[in-house]
């Protein structure tokens, strides 16, 4: 009898535990007998720790799943409505709250409607809930991101790019998995529940990640989804088109996505001023005056995907990708020595390049008991690169200099990664992982100078990171061990590293917080720089690889303060970076009096960057203004040079939306970069955009640089022996008109899509370039 009681009790406890792991909270938000669409719904603990959140659908409904037993507060708010808080004490079973009534309210302050903040500051990320107006006026996931105005994030709809003011890349994700920009372009705004913004990402996201933007989207069931996003110019060969299809059947999902990019302009040219100084003290300056020529590029990206989910317990995903890119460039210029302008030579340069990159990505994710998870990912990639370049200098049809070079490259790589995560307490989490990468590059160089390279590269890392929160104080500490190996014939290196990372934050109130972040990382030389290869640039210059390059160390420190008051918000950010023995360029004269441009481990490089960002809006739910400005100070020390440089930059943007219409105007001046001995001028541009949305169709237009007729970019080289300055121009980048159409349709979707949480990729071909 006692055994039966014990067995029955055990079974009952197990059922309660299993049931508690799938607690649901749902309801319907109504005001004056009408459903409230896109109301913000947030579930949090009694001490304001975020648990789950989202927005109501078109019928005012919401549902939150997989909630653990406990006591919570359900906060409901919406633009033009009073907020309501519902206490959910001792929640242990699923609960249907039924109809929840909220009252209309409009608070006016000097003719401006003040709305509640939609940003929740969690310990390791910011949780941003889109407003109803943003969801209705945005045409896709990218335009929604632009309207949400995340701090230190820049959205460029003309080029379909998302960048950060900080050093590194921006990772785009959907439900935790790395997503391509093409996925965001065909994402329906109404499917977005919230955006989780990791502006200080942890070790699991990699060393070169400035920010992670994770779209948390609705999970659908059976049916399918078709979407198209087309962006094309009627007067210039300029286009970016995306198409995606997803079909669900029971526990399986099949997907196909295709992207096509093309560019072609007939009015591209460059101007160069190059000075060459010899050991005997003599020197001369050569001038290159460009003649308008053609450049073109196009690419295709195809992905086939299959995934299988078993009731949210485990998830398998397989993806086969193929990317193809081809470019052509023709340059014509007149060459002459500044001291002898009458002696003119004609320069002709023609180059083509082609890259084919197939890959296979296998992914497995498993949810374990006690709030644990395990992720395993394996990616294999092959990159086939073919390029050739011809360069001549001469008079009429008599070449005085004739250079021809070809590169045939083959690179094979494998990336394997495993991640384990566990929630230790309600306010702390442990994350640990291992990653292994193996690469083999086999390149053949031909033409005037021939050579072959075979390079092997291995990287292995393991990390552990612990994060938590105590009242208003939050922290994170991580430690990463790494091993790097490179071998080319008898040359190479082996390097072991132990790298710490620290994050400390304090939240003074819901609207003010301050954070410090420090880390040490290593940077490896690229395979393209380490090949024992020489490539002729022109009659005077040579580009050379350097197999003696070594890994170098990077130290980063960041201090940030964020504040919000009504319609005003701001961010103050101060960063300092120091690189010890960085790989930077140098120019030397060889025994043949040729000027050899190569890379070497130099002494140090420093960058100091204070930045201020201010935002105002939305004013009457129509206008939003933003302005950011900063200063970059660089200190670059080489073995035989020392340069300092200071650059002031700014960026301004105004956005407007009214009913189904939305528009924006953004402008940015040169944000220059100085590294080694090279000053690279950033873009100075402005863009105007207007769009109209009707149901699932969004049509619009954009104009790049509508108010100028001279677009250029360039740079300077401050070498002692061969300084230079260059500008290159693209006439078609002025008053470039682009029409845009976005359309999507879904049918019968009820299957809950579970996304993978990591994605690895290899896109570096590892070949040395020979052009200027």
Where do the protein language model's features map onto the residues?
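Short, acidic Ser/Thr/Gly-rich low-complexity loop/linker segments typical of extracellular
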Residues: 47-61
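Short acidic/polar hinge/loop motifs at secondary-structure boundaries
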Residues: 175-202, 304
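Face-selective signature of the C-terminal outer-membrane beta-barrel domain
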Residues: 299-327, 350-500, 507, 568-576, ...
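Extracytoplasmic beta-strand/coil segments of soluble accessory domains associated
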Residues: 142-177
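N-terminal periplasmic accessory domains that precede
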Residues: 96-101, 111, 141-144, 160-162, ...
């Amino acid at each position: 009898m006692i055994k039966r009681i014990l067995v029955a009790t055990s079974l009952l406890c197990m059922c309660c535990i299993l049931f508690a792991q799938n607690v649901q909270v749902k309801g319907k938000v109504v005001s004056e007998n009408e459903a409230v669409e896109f109301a913000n719904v947030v579930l949090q603990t009694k001490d304001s720790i975020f648990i789950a959140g989202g927005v109501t659908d078109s019928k005012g409904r919401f549902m939150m799943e997989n909630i653990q037993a406990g006591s919570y507060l359900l906060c409901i708010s919406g633009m033009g409505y009073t907020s309501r808080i519902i206490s959910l004490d001792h929640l242990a079973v699923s609960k249907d709250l039924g109809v929840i009534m909220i009252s209309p309210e409009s608070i006016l302050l000097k003719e401006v409607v003040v709305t509640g903040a939609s940003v929740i500051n969690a310990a390791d990320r910011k949780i941003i809930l889109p407003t109803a107006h943003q969801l209705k006026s945005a045409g896709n996931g990218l335009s929604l991101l632009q309207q949400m105005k995340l701090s230190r994030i820049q959205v460029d709809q003309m080029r379909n790019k998302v960048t950060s003011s900080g050093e590194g890349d921006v990772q785009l994700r959907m439900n935790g998995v790395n997503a391509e920009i093409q996925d965001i372009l065909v994402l329906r705004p109404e499917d977005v529940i919230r955006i989780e913004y990791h502006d200080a990402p942890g070790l699991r996201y990699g060393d070169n990640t400035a920010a992670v933007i994770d779209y948390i989207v609705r999970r659908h069931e059976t049916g399918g989804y078709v979407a198209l996003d087309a962006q094309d110019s009627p007067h210039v060969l300029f286009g970016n088109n995306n198409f995606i299809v997803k079909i669900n059947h029971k526990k399986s999902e099949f997907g196909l996505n295709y992207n096509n990019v093309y560019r072609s302009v007939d009015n591209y040219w460059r101007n160069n001023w190059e000075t060459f100084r010899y050991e005997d003290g003599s020197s001369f300056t050569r001038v290159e005056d460009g003649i308008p020529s053609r450049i073109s590029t196009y690419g295709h990206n195809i992905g086939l995907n299959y995934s299988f989910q078993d009731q949210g317990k485990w998830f398998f995903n397989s993806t086969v990708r193929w990317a193809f890119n081809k470019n052509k460039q023709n340059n014509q210029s007149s060459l002459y020595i500044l001291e002898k302008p009458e002696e003119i030579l004609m320069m002709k340069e023609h180059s083509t390049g082609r890259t084919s990159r197939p890959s296979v990505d296998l992914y497995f994710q498993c949810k374990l008991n006690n709030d644990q998870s395990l992720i395993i990912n394996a990616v294999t990639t092959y990159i086939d690169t073919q390029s050739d370049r011809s360069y001549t200098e001469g008079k009429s049809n008599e070449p005085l200099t004739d250079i021809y070079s070809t590169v045939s490259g083959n690179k094979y790589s494998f990336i394997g990664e495993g991640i384990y995560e566990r929630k230790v307490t309600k306010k702390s989490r442990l994350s640990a992982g291992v990653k292994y990468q193996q690469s083999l590059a086999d390149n053949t160089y031909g033409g005037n100078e021939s050579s072959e390279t075979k390079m092997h590269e291995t990287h292995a890392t393991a990390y552990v990171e612990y994060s938590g929160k105590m009242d208003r104080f939050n922290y994170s500490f991580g430690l990463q061990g790494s091993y790097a190996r490179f071998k080319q014939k008898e040359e190479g290196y082996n390097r072991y590293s132990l790298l710490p990372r620290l994050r400390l934050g304090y939240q003074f109130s819901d609207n003010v917080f301050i954070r410090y972040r420090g880390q040490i990382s290593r940077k490896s030389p690229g395979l393209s720089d380490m090949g024992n290869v020489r490539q002729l640039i022109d009659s005077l210059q040579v580009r050379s690889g350097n197999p003696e390059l070594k890994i170098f160390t990077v130290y980063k420190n960041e201090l940030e303060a964020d504040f919000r008051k009504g319609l005003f918000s701001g961010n103050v950010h101060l960063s300092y970076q120091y690189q010890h023995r960085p790989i930077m360029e140098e120019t030397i004269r060889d025994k043949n009096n040729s000027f050899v441009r190569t890379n070497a481990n130099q002494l140090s490089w420093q960058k100091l960057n204070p930045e201020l960002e201010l935002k105002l809006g939305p004013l009457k739910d129509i206008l939003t203004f933003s302005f950011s400005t900063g200063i970059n100070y660089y200190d670059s020390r080489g073995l035989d040079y020392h340069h300092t440089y200071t650059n002031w930059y700014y960026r301004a943007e105004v956005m407007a939306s009214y009913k189904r219409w939305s528009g924006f105007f953004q402008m940015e001046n040169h944000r220059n970069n100085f590294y080694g001995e090279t000053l690279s001028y950033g873009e100075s541009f402005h863009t105007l955009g207007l769009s109209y949305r009707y149901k699932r169709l969004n049509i619009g237009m954009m104009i790049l640089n509508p108010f100028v007729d001279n677009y250029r970019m360039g740079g300077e080289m401050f070498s002692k022996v061969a300084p230079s300055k260059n500008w290159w121009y693209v006439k078609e980048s002025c008053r470039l008109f682009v029409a845009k159409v976005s359309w999507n349709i879904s049918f019968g979707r009820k299957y809950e899509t579970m996304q993978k949480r990591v994605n690895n990729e290899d896109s570096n071909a590892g070949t040395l370039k020979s052009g200027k």
